[in-house]
Amino acid sequence: MLTLVSYDVVSDARRDRVANALLDFGRRVQYSVFECHLDDGELGTLRARVAALIDSATDSVRYYRVCAQCERDVAVEGLGRYEGARGTIIV
């Protein structure tokens, strides 16, 4: 399932570690936003990994699950394009 991940991490070093972890699971679509196609197990693994990297007193990470119907309605304005699961380009 498409999972949109956004984050606000105060420390530059922690922010880089979070971004690198997210790159293992998906693709960056904006500076602090990633699109990841994950099953429930992968999402759990990602959340545990990210939780170990952030300071929960100052940082935040949000995970939004996007259903298949809603994923079909994804639209992009301006720079970039939406790529579905496994690199399929949705036009």
Label every model-predicted segment:
Residues D12-A13, F25, T45, S60-Y63, ...:
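Intrinsically disordered, low-complexity sequence elements enriched in Ser/Thr/Gly/Pro
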Residues Q30, E35-S60:
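Short, intrinsically disordered low-complexity segments
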Residues R14, N20-A21, L46, E77, ...:
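Short leucine-rich amphipathic alpha-helices used at interfaces
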Residues A52-V91:
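C-terminal structural segments of small proteins and small subunits
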Residues M1-E42:
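Extended, hydrophobic alpha-helical segments
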Residues L22-G26, V50-A51, E71:
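A broad, low-specificity signal for short, low-complexity segments enriched in glycine/proline
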